[in-house]
Amino acid sequence: MKILYPGTFDPLTNGHLDLIQRAEKLFGNVVVAVLENTSKKPTFNLNKRLVQIKNAVSHLSNISVISYEGLTVDCAKEVNANLILRGLRAMSDFEYELQIAHTNKSLNTEIETIFLSTNTNYSFLSSSLVKEVAKFGGEIDHMVPDSVERDLKNYFKKD
């Protein structure tokens, strides 16, 4: 079984990585699909985010990392995944994600959305929060993989 895990991952957090590892155990093959969202200005460009994720999952055997633009259901169909993975940190996530899941279902009835609750160790994490902490020199080693930590520290380095 193959599941698609879409997102901007700007940057990848340990919460994202935990979901990827758990999804691999549950579903076998995980395709991490990095959205090239032209309406947002990401901290890291698409290629950097792809490299960050590939480095973080290099020890896992059934993970592929791709980029996409457009509709997530089209990406899922393109990679032959009939499941889409979404992580839930709080009830507020559920309301938003359920709306997206219903929209995706209306676009392609063959694709199901699977929700996994975030590990409580990471339930406070978001990419935005990590960037905010890094910007002000806070410790982020428990929030992101090593390579992402280095990249963030370099990005926010004060001269």
UniProtKB/Swiss-Prot annotation:
Checking HAMAP family in the record gives:
PPAT_bact (MF_00151)
Family statement: Belongs to the bacterial CoaD family.
Subunit structure, interactors included: Homohexamer.
Named from the GO MF annotations, one term is: pantetheine-phosphate adenylyltransferase activity
Q: What is this protein called?
A: Phosphopantetheine adenylyltransferase
What reactions does this protein catalyze? (R)-4'-phosphopantetheine + ATP + H(+) = 3'-dephospho-CoA + diphosphate
Q: Where is this site: Transition state stabilizer?
A: 16
Identify the pathway: Cofactor biosynthesis; coenzyme A biosynthesis; CoA from (R)-pantothenate: step 4/5
Instruction: Give the EC number(s) under which this enzyme is classified.
Output: 2.7.7.3
Tell whether Cytoplasm is among the UniProt keywords. yes
What cofactor(s) does the depicted protein rely on?
Mg(2+)
Protein task: Reversibly transfers an adenylyl group from ATP to 4'-phosphopantetheine, yielding dephospho-CoA (dPCoA) and pyrophosphate.
What GO biological process, any one, is recorded here?
coenzyme A biosynthetic process
User: According to the UniProt entry, where is the signal peptide?
Assistant: none
* Gene3D superfamilies for this protein: HUPs
Which parts of the sequence bind ATP?
8-9, 16, 87-89, 97, 122-128
Q: Where in the cell is it found?
A: Cytoplasm
Where is substrate bound in this sequence? Answer: 8, 40, 72, 86
- Name the principal localization, coarsely classed: cytoplasm
Q: Which UniProt keywords apply?
A: ATP-binding, Coenzyme A biosynthesis, Cytoplasm, Magnesium, Nucleotide-binding, Nucleotidyltransferase, Transferase
Q: Give the encoding gene's name.
A: coaD
Entries under InterPro entries matching the protein: Cyt_trans-like, PPAT, Rossmann-like_a/b/a_fold
